[in-house]
Amino acid sequence: MLKTALALGLAAIAAVSTTSLPATANDAAGTYKLDRAHASLVWKVNHLGLSFYTARFDTFDATLDINPDEPQSAKLEVTVDPTSIRTGFPFSDAKDFDKELVQSPNFFNAKEHPEIKFVSTSIERTGDKTAKVTGDLTLLGVTKPVTLDVTLNGQMAHPMKKKPALGFSGVGKIKRSEFGMTHLVGGVGDEVELLLEAEFIKE
């Protein structure tokens, strides 16, 4: 469930960045890499109908290829390391909950599925700085189409890198059962909310 977040969120940048980047097309076009120091991937899932349990992935990467003259041809590829999950479980002396989620066949089963991947397939602009990005998400060996709502927060020449930079927020929802993660559905929600914040810098 968490893995999805990452892939989805990053995909969104493709949509808005290609339609909202600065007017200098020659400068804006090209390949952008995720600034991992300024990115976060968080997921939320309902717990017993009482609250939303939150966690994150610490290790993920993404590449965005864009051409302002052909925004619909933008391509985003994202990879997530499922072993980088962090739940903040407070009783680590009792058990390693993160490791349990990573290794268990009921959840991420990272030994059999060491990577989560997203590849964008289409972009639909919904506003000056918003878009819906659809792509193929592969999780637990299952590939399904997913869509993320993305907002371009801003773009500029990075003050330190001296290169074009983009910043965005992405939100989306998936059903983990559709990817085969059905364990404890009922007590732990099937629907997973994804929250992404990210900056991209042109290579």
Cite the ranges covered by each PLM segment.
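Bacterial N-terminal signal peptides that target proteins for export
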Residues: 1-9
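Low-complexity, acidic/polar, glycine-enriched regions of mature
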Residues: 21-203
